[in-house]
Amino acid sequence: MAQRTGLEDPERYLFVDRAVIYNPATQADWTAKKLVWIPSERHGFEAASIKEERGDEVMVELAENGKKAMVNKDDIQKMNPPKFSKVEDMAELTCLNEASVLHNLKDRYYSGLIYTYSGLFCVVINPYKNLPIYSENIIEMYRGKKRHEKPPHIYAISESAYRCMLQDRKDQSILCTGESGAGKTENTKKVIQYLAHVASSHKGRKDHNIPGELERQLLQANPILESFGNAKTVKNDNSSRFGKFIRINFDVTGYIVGANIETYLLEKSRAVRQAKDERTFHIFYQLLSGAGEHLKSDLLLEGFNNYRFLSNGYIPIPGQQDKDNFQETMEAMHIMGFSHEEILSMLKVVSSVLQFGNISFKKERNTDQASMPENTVAQKLCHLLGMNVMEFTRAILTPRIKVGRDYVQKAQTKEQADFAVEALAKATYERLFRWLVHRINKALDRTKRQGTSFIGILDIAGFEIFELNSFEQLCINYTNEKLQQLFNHTMFILEQEEYQREGIEWNFIDFGLDLQPCIDLIERPANPPGVLALLDEECWFPKATDKTFVEKLVQEQGSHSKFQKPRQLKDKADFCIIHYAGKVDYKADEWLMKNMDPLNDNVATLLHQSSDRFVAELWKDVDRIVGLDQVTGMTETAFGSAYKTKKGMFRNVGQLYKESLTKLMATLRNTNPNFVRCIIPNHEKRAGKLDPHLVLDQLRCNGVLEGIRICRQGFPNRIVFQEFRQRYEILTPNAIPKGFMDGKQACERMIRALELDPNLYRIGQSKIFFRAGVLAHLEEERDLKITDIIIFFQAVCRGYLARKAFAKKQQQLSALKVLQRNCAAYLKLRHWQWWRVFTKVKPLLQVTRQEEELQAKDEELLKVKEKQTKVEGELEEMERKHQQLLEEKNILAEQLQAETELFAEAEEMRARLAAKKQELEEILHDLESRVEGEEERNQILQNEKKKMQAHIQDLEEQLDEEEGARQKLQLEKVTAEAKIKKMEEEVLLLEDQNSKFIKEKKLMEDRIAECSSQLAEEEEKAKNLAKIRNKQEVMISDLEERLKKEEKTRQELEKAKRKLDGETTDLQDQIAELQAQVDELKVQLTKKEEELQGALARGDDETLHKNNALKVARELQAQIAELQEDFESEKASRNKAEKQKRDLSEELEALKTELEDTLDTTAAQQELRTKREQEVAELKKALEDETKNHEAQIQDMRQRHATALEELSEQLEQAKRFKANLEKNKQGLETDNKELACEVKVLQQVKAESEHKRKKLDAQVQELHAKVSEGDRLRVELAEKANKLQNELDNVSTLLEEAEKKGMKFAKDAAGLESQLQDTQELLQEETRQKLNLSSRIRQLEEEKNSLQEQQEEEEEARKNLEKQVLALQSQLADTKKKVDDDLGTIEGLEEAKKKLLKDVEALSQRLEEKVLAYDKLEKTKNRLQQELDDLTVDLDHQRQIVSNLEKKQKKFDQLLAEEKGISARYAEERDRAEAEAREKETKALSLARALEEALEAKEEFERQNKQLRADMEDLMSSKDDVGKNVHELEKSKRALEQQVEEMRTQLEELEDELQATEDAKLRLEVNMQAMKAQFERDLQTRDEQNEEKKRLLLKQVRELEAELEDERKQRALAVASKKKMEIDLKDLEAQIEAANKARDEVIKQLRKLQAQMKDYQRELEEARASRDEIFAQSKESEKKLKSLEAEILQLQEELASSERARRHAEQERDELADEIANSASGKSALLDEKRRLEARIAQLEEELEEEQSNMELLNDRFRKTTLQVDTLNTELAAERSAAQKSDNARQQLERQNKELKAKLQELEGAVKSKFKATISALEAKIGQLEEQLEQEAKERAAANKLVRRTEKKLKEIFMQVEDERRHADQYKEQMEKANARMKQLKRQLEEAEEEATRANASRRKLQRELDDATEANEGLSREVSTLKNRLRRGGPISFSSSRSGRRQLHIEGASLELSDDDTESKTSDVNETQPPQSE
């Protein structure tokens, strides 16, 4: 930007004075102090200078007050040089960090510069004051300027978008985002102001009737929207409480032709309540302040304090008057074209909203019902809205609600009534706002001019992160996620498009996908559903609440990476989403209500039926709202009728918003977006104050830092070649030579001279691109260079000035000497008399000469005057002639221009006619193909009809057969039911016996159940721990110990059993049975233990095999890696051989050219010899004979040589192709060969062979080199010995023969190579076969391993089941001993110990949480360091580059300056020290990694011990005898655990110290640690999900089983009545068939009548076409005339072209002859005659050319005559058009007749039954096709008439088209009549057959299903009854099972039944109704 001093007032807020910034003193101060940024609580960041470094901390001195402080290195951020102060684009900053960005924005803001570029977008900070930078002068300053030509401004963004739209013809968008009060609305208005000024449609136009009306309306739309949609908040006095997208349409020329506004998320709740110190929408205050008395009385207005909805009364806005704003709003409405009635109706609705708030309800005494004690307010409200007061009161207090199929009056409570009134007020205002926007769009819509492009301006709130966020914040943040994704994608796309334009190598990166997980979390419809989908789903569920919604959300999305449970606000927030801008806690209160937005549909219906048309229009979509019955149905009924009737009739708020957002994003994606980020500087609304922390938060939320980061990942600094050369050529003084050089080449030379790293720059087509910081480095080098040059220049200037002063003094000294000498001489001569005489006489000598000189001058003056007059006359004559020639030239040019234009028009007409003809021919072909297709379809339908008739007959036969089978099945069903009843009776007897037995054991079972439940819980814990540990040995030892304990307890129980035998005989029998069962279980347990041991042994063998296999696999991988290296070397050698092969072929080609050169030299020598033969006559004949012989031999040898070379080249090409194929195969096999071990040997052999080949080829190349050198020697000898031609020719022949031999030899070599390549291919195939075999073997091993693992898991499950049975028996026997009472004390003691342990565990978990918080702190530090990671890497590269540059300079100047050696040594020492520090940090990082691993291992050990402790607790709970011992062990383990925790604490403290010290190295380790942690969490999560899934599946299976049982009951009840229904259905079918036949006959009759009417219409159409044909005949005559004229024109053009070709041919011959004359100097005398002849021929041709030109003029005259004839023909065509109009009238009459036909068909459709609707609709479709064809014909006719106006040759094609269409239309109508009849008959028959078939199939399937169910139930019950009888006889365990489902089982084992009487009866009924599967 140009430097400016003394800036004017507006420019002071736009431009920066760079002269102040480029201050050398400031630069030197910055360099000396090592300034950096350090964190500050007050200022965000403060400037400080580094004084001392102490390890990880740095001593700094604050620049502001000089205080010193210790700061961690990680908290320091680099500072940019002073020359980057107040930079206009922050992407240019070399050190890009939060501190630098904040400092730059702060400096510019304090200087009044509120606009700053940040990469590709613009950042705006609200100044909170008016700046003079928005005037028309500023607009004109930015108009037509590019972005970089002017300082940052919203006008620059608007201008860029406007110019891009005009140039690229692509729609544009400007996206303004930011917090409330940041200035989004104001910047939106400035954009509209700029576009309205720049693209005003009335500027430069002739129409001044309504100057700029559209632009005025566009500007006045904002005040209206602000009045109804803006409000005063704490942050902003004019806050937009809605988002809007303003779409401004432009025409092709860039003028505004219309606009459209779309709004989003109006905060309608503000209309009913406001926060403290806030206002509702402006219109309420404006209306109450500005309305006159008459208007107030009409609207029933009162004071501010009389309205409940104005929560805070009247709150004025500083600097604004609501009364004046009301007048401005009314004036804006008038400008927008609002009528007085519309304005009054709107204000009535506004007043009614206030009246809603004044309605008060009262709770009645004895009930909760609400009542309205005072209805005055209701009367006012109903008066304003046009409703009945009584109906309104009834609808509010006792609305009608649909329950089932009936409507009931439901009384409302006071809370429900208040809620309904507020909801109505909000809905009314929202609908008013929507109508207002629609009305403004209607006013801004213009249909006169078509808009081709548009610019959209988006004004929407940015990310909102409060302490607790609701549904509105979710919608806003969801929108911003989508916009940020669009920003990332678009920004980097633009950057990369420039790279592609400039031809830079670049890998495409899409940053838009980074935000996709969070977007999916919100909007995903299913699998799993997102937040909005779950909210919609929950809205439909009965008895759903916000709590159930949150539970579902956690269940579905709990594992999502962007979803978390709140940590800090656990009690307040429900869930947390990680947005782009940060973590946001959401509170889901009233989300269901907000999403449904329910209304009192009774009142809504009254509003819809209002007497006020405006109110009725607002509520016209009343059928799409959620009513009270909907909400009632959710809370009281389970999917009631209200749910069914209302579903699908409306969409929820979330769904509507998602759709509108999707539409908006689709619009924005199709545009070129321009981003404007608005920032609020403070919340006090004070000008000149900037809160650093607030701005930093907004920068993060707006993505400013992220955007710059994305921009800097590429090459953010770029400069055009010319500017780079001009600015930095000073650094490379001798790199560019003098003279002209292309800019790109010059820059490449400069870059090479600067010795830059190639990774730091890219050279494009017009610019050179640099990484961040490179230009800053070049600037520093340039400053140093300029400083040296200036110093040198000053020295030169001082020397020059000193020398010049010295020379001047010397000159003065010599002049003084001359003056002194002259003065001394004058003093001597002044008294001499002759001197006096001399001084007096000398002047007189010139007097006589002066007169002579004057006379000579006078004569000379007269001559000059005469010449001047003569020249002036000649000049006038020349000017007159020149003017005359110019006039003639202009006339000729105009004539020539007119003729060329006429010719071009004629040519264009011919091209258009040819294109039209082609189009008509294509249409004709399409029509013909359609006719053929219709015929084929008719034939297909005919065939289908025959097939369907045959199918109907088959179905009738099947129906008869199935009827007989059904009767048989009915008989079998009756017998089966009798058997089932008998079985049920037997089962009831058995159940009675079981119930008696169960009653006796009921008391005992209750206590058993309690203990078993406790043991089951402990067992579940043990099982989970066992799964985690996977230690089979520990589990086996536990089993052995438990078995021993069980044996002891069994012995004790036997003793107790003997005692109990004397007490109760019944119990003795039961205990004996239990004892027998225990013995059996013991035997089974021993067997299972043996099986478990075998399984464990097999598992050990399998693990051993697996380890061996893994070892073999690792060895194979190592071998494959070696093989890969050998293969790469082999590939390199092969490439080298290929290169040598190419070199060899090139040498052969060179040899061939050399041989041809030798032949050329021999030909030249032969010519010399012929010249000598002319001089020596005697030798002429002999030499001619010899030359002939030699020529024949040479020709023969050439042919042989050429053929040999061609064959050789073909063989080489074949070898290359074959080799290329082999290379492809080889590359395909490379990936597979990695797994094969034998490839090493094969490829080594191949390598040896290829090495051998390479050596062979090297030898061949050397031989060829030798032969080439020999050829060179022979060629030299041939040139020296010209007299020995014969010998030289012999040598050439021998050389050719040798070349042929070489070619043959090379062909043999190629064949050898080919065979070797074939061998290689065979070897590769063999290797692939071996690889496949090995892979199949590996798969077999894996399958065997999987099968063994499955067996092991099954055995483990069996073992666990045995453990459960053993534990159950143990608990039961313990209860029988009655020792439970004695053990209760110990159990309580154990529970207390357990509670203590749980407390200890909780304390440990708290400590772990503290450690987690410490880790979070470290993660924050890591995030801060991550932001500077890119800059650090860049700086590291920069430092390495500096070191390399210094090394190079050391080598250059080592011999010249001794001081440079010291400097280079110092730099080398610094480099070594830096490298040592880096190595030391790397070692620290490794030690840290080891320490972390040790900590993780200690943590795992702690977890294992914790789990062991829980296992010990379980053992304590299960074993009652060793209580004290276990407690002691628990205490010991507790102490050990606490000791380990203490050790872990110390270790973690050491780790924290080391982590704080080596934060840079820790970054890599934390990434790995996070990955491991995420993997562990994912594993746990998947395990939990699997458990939950199993649980859900079990519940689902239970529900399915219950549903199946219920269905079976229903089917059994309906089975008896099915036969009667089938018979009735058959009778109905027969009756329907008869009725259908009758209706079919009636339709056939009606169709015949229609066909007769169609024939009459066709006759009328033919008459109309006959009249049209007469018109076409007349037009054909005119076409013939045109054709003849066209033929003449074409003939003349051909003649002209032939003459032109002849002229060019003659000129070509002349040029060739001239060349021959010039070349043939020896035959000059013989060619002179030929030259004269040719000159005569040329003269003749020139005469002919002149004749052709005269003919051309005649042709032009004739062409003009033809144009006149064309004009006359056009007049004739005008007459023809009137005749064509008559034919159009006839066509319209036919269309009317067709419409009448359609009406008749509709009447027929109403008469025929519903089953024939499809047939009638098909007929309508056919008639519609005819109408479309007629309309198409009309369109083509109209297009043809338009083309006739322009050209004379279109009549023929149009008439031919009309004739073809007439003929085709006749054919189509005939075919359609036939097709209609066929289609009608076929469809009728098809429908009848399909209905009959479906009915028959349904009945057959139903009967078959019932039969199958009955047979299955019968057989299953019979089997179960038999098994039950057998088991009862044996006295063994009885199990009733539903084998059909396999999921519910009831085990009865002796005395261990666990069912009550009720349960037994229900189970019995379930068993009776369960059917086992029947195998068919």
Curated annotation (Swiss-Prot):
Post-translational modification: Phosphorylated by ABL2.
Modification Phosphothreonine, positions: 1960
Region feature (Actin-binding): 661-683
Compositional bias ranges of the Polar residues kind: 1967-1976
Sites where the protein binds ATP: 178-185
Gene Ontology cellular-component terms listed: actomyosin; axon; brush border; cell cortex; cell surface; cleavage furrow; cytoplasm; cytoplasmic side of plasma membrane
All copies of domain IQ, residue ranges: 786-815
Highest taxon above the source species: Eukaryota
Secretion signal span: none
Subcellular location: Cell projection, Lamellipodium
Composition bias, Basic and acidic residues: 1129-1155, 1698-1708
Family annotation (InterPro entries): IQ_motif_EF-hand-BS, Kinesin_motor_dom_sf, Myosin_head_motor_dom-like, Myosin_N, Myosin_S1_N, Myosin_tail, P-loop_NTPase
Chain residue ranges for the region called Disordered: 1125-1175, 1697-1718, 1874-1976
Recorded family membership: Belongs to the TRAFAC class myosin-kinesin ATPase superfamily. Myosin family.
General function of this protein: Involved with LARP6 in the stabilization of type I collagen mRNAs for CO1A1 and CO1A2. During cell spreading, plays an important role in cytoskeleton reorganization, focal contacts formation (in the central part but not the margins of spreading cells), and lamellipodial extension; this function is mechanically antagonized by MYH9. Cellular myosin that appears to play a role in cytokinesis, cell shape, and specialized functions such as secretion and capping.
Assembly, per entry: Myosin is a hexameric protein that consists of 2 heavy chain subunits (MHC), 2 alkali light chain subunits (MLC) and 2 regulatory light chain subunits (MLC-2). Interacts with PLEKHG6. Interacts with ECPAS. Interacts with KIF26B. Interacts with LARP6. Interacts with MCC. Interacts with CFAP95.
Protein name listed in UniProt: Myosin-10
Lineage: Eukaryota, Metazoa, Chordata, Craniata, Vertebrata
Gene designation per UniProt: Myh10
